[in-house]
Amino acid sequence: MALWRIDEEETPLASLCTVAEQQEAAAFAAPRRRLEYLAWHALLHALLPEAHAAHDPEGGPVLVFPSSGQNTPANIPGGLPHRQNCIRPDTGLHKNARSENIPFQHTRFGDPLQTGEFAPLRHIGVSHAHGYAAVILSAQPCAVDIEPADSDFSRAARRFISPQEQALQPCALPEALFPALVWCAKEAVYKWVRISGLSLLHDIRITEIHPETTRTNPSGTGFPALEAFHRLTVTAAGKTLQLHGFTVEGICCVYGIG
């Protein structure tokens, strides 16, 4: 999982994306939406240069691997450039740490098949909000959601937080942060299970929230220490899922793999 603070202007970001992605970004009227769209695609290319993103029938992102490597930006280095504005909190790697090369073979049907240590990274989760973009890649279904930690949920909270869930709020967690943590967790699960029409209040239920050890980022990332690490247990669509949440620079982030 990687989180990107969007410091770049639109033109430098566009240079890290394919022509098709640049055209798709241009369809957004709002400059912020164009930046966020370009940023998460650039981050995907930095993490996994061989991959592009498409969408399934439900609109969720999926990884695709053009076998000929066509339409790949020539200046993508296969690593994480601009090291001051990206961090991978699950590994401690930051933006000047280069991604490992991922070898490919092909199936008898001609489809690209990843091999080696990171095989097969078939799943992707994406989120972007207020000048940040996040991408998670995994061999298993995965999802991520980010939101400003100080978002005002005073009117909406009752539509996605049950009294039982409210009672789970850890004493050490600031009261104003709790709704953002729950919102991100439920949004991540909604994207994870990919079943349209689920109710955040009734169908996606948080059953446990436990503090985790706060982690310190390596020097040179440009990010302060990650805060408010929590592990959440969530039930949805007959499944029990484990998620991890943290805050950094006023952004709440929750992600899960499994």
Question: Which role does the model predict for each range below?
Answer:
Residues 1-258:
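Core catalytic alpha/beta fold that binds nucleotide/phospho-ligands
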